[in-house]
Amino acid sequence: MASTADFKNGLVLQIDGQLWSIVEFQHVKPGKGPAFVRTKLKNVLSGKVVDKTYNAGVKVETATVDRRDTTYLYRDGSDFVFMDSQDYEQHPLPESLVGDAARFLLEGMPVQVAFHDGAPLYIELPVTVEIVVTHTEPGLQGDRSSAGTKPATLETGAQINVPLFINTGDKLKVDSRDGGYLGRVNA
């Protein structure tokens, strides 16, 4: 059990038998009336996001989620295989559980896997990922019909928009949460 004062991003709540992760929260104390907490909750299994409001001080059931450091090893058909960094046990996770994170998953990458009651729930990639551009069109100096970006294909097959000066073979820093370009890695 946790009070609304204990809320933080990433805390997993158990509501009506389902697991919900706090994505965003805000304590509100209006001039008139009792204080309350506005939250944005994401269903851990389905990914559905809902808004929920709690009165301040209310106790809420929390779920015990064990986050383990793992290393991504390889893809086996529709499964992604991760190795636990402590006991070296391998965990095959289905593509549905890995979800959108597969866009930036590289072999040997450190990844956190969240478990509840021994079953894997979801994975968390590092916030920034260093990844190589395998294909992009050459950017022309006077080509400014767009906002100065062009599409690029990464070594994982993902496509992102990059500035015009990026070339094939460049190593980039990419935000794994939204696929945004963060910068070029200096060799």
Swiss-Prot record:
Pathway, per record: Protein biosynthesis; polypeptide chain elongation
GO molecular function terms noted in the UniProt entry: translation elongation factor activity
Species the sequence originates in: Mycobacterium marinum (strain ATCC BAA-535 / M)
Keywords: Cytoplasm, Elongation factor, Protein biosynthesis
Family from the record: Belongs to the elongation factor P family.
CDD domains, A to Z: S1_EF-P_repeat_1 (cd04470), S1_EF-P_repeat_2 (cd05794)
Gene Ontology biological-process entries: peptide biosynthetic process
NCBIfam families given in the database record: efp, PRK00529.1
Record-level GO cellular component terms: cytoplasm
UniProt protein name: Elongation factor P
Main localisation: cytoplasm
Keyword presence, Cytoplasm: yes
HAMAP family the UniProt entry points to: EF_P
Function, as annotated: Involved in peptide bond synthesis. Stimulates efficient translation and peptide-bond synthesis on native or reconstituted 70S ribosomes in vitro. Probably functions indirectly by altering the affinity of the ribosome for aminoacyl-tRNA, thus increasing their reactivity as acceptors for peptidyl transferase.
Highest taxon listed in the record's lineage: Bacteria
Location relative to the cell: Cytoplasm
